[in-house]
Swiss-Prot record:
Name this polypeptide is given: Rho GDP-dissociation inhibitor 1
Modified residues (N6-succinyllysine): 141
Modified residues (N6-acetyllysine): 43, 105, 127, 141, 178
Residue positions, PTM N-acetylalanine: 2
Tissue: Brain, lung, thymus, spleen, small intestine, and kidney, and weakly in heart and liver.
């Protein structure tokens, strides 16, 4: 039996139900200080120096100005019942993702994992923002607060809370997702598009 596609009215209703108030918050982020400035502050205070070393680690700061401070490397759909890895390499050709699609079985629980590196300076208030579209209609927007991170050689990983994939005849089909990794300064560290297909089973 052919799967029933949602009508324009049904998509509009879904969008309305998922619409969140986007009131601006009266919040002013603190002035950004470099790692060097932080390390120079109260440098004669031995206890404070040890505290900052424990907090920041022995930072090997990248001096190459051509390397972005924040590099987003991978997006992974973490799902214990998936038959294989669901991963996007974000260091390659981002345009190719528009021609591919993850398959997700309806109703399964999953999380999104973002892997990234911070190379030179502390980044405050990082956020992962995701807009979901169905047939060109935006049906959902989700903001995830990632937090503040300092430079280190190892990658960081951020996991979203557990979510349940939509289910039911009207939920099955293709979704276009526009993702963005940003921060308090509204720096666009990376923006990319990818596709998700909800099916009754993992494989037809």
């Amino acid at each position: 039996m052919a799967e029933q596609e949602p009508t324009a009215e049904q998509l509009a209703q879904i969008a309305a139900e998922n619409e969140e108030d986007e009131h601006s918050v009266n919040y002013k982020p603190p002035a950004q200080k470099s790692i060097q400035e932080i390390q120079e502050l109260d440098k004669d205070d031995e206890s404070l120096r040890k505290y900052k070393e424990a907090l920041l680690g022995r930072v090997a700061v990248s001096a190459d100005p051509n390397v972005p401070n924040v590099v987003v490397t991978r997006l992974t759909l973490v799902c214990s019942t998936a038959p294989g890895p669901l991963e996007l390499d974000l260091t390659g050709d981002l345009e190719s993702f528009k021609k591919q699609s993850f398959v997700l079985k309806e109703g399964v629980e999953y999380r999104i994992k973002i892997s990234f590196r911070v190379n030179r300076e502390i980044v405050s208030g990082m956020k992962y923002i995701q807009h979901t579209y169905r047939k060109g209609v935006k049906i959902d927007k989700t903001d995830y607060m990632v937090g503040s991170y300092g430079p280190r050689a190892e990658e960081y990983e951020f996991l979203t809370p557990m979510e349940e994939a939509p289910k039911g005849m009207l939920a099955r089909g293709s979704y276009n997702i526009k993702s963005r990794f940003t921060d308090d300064d509204r720096t666009d560290h990376l923006s990319w598009e990818w596709n998700l297909t909800i099916k009754k089973e993992w494989k037809d």
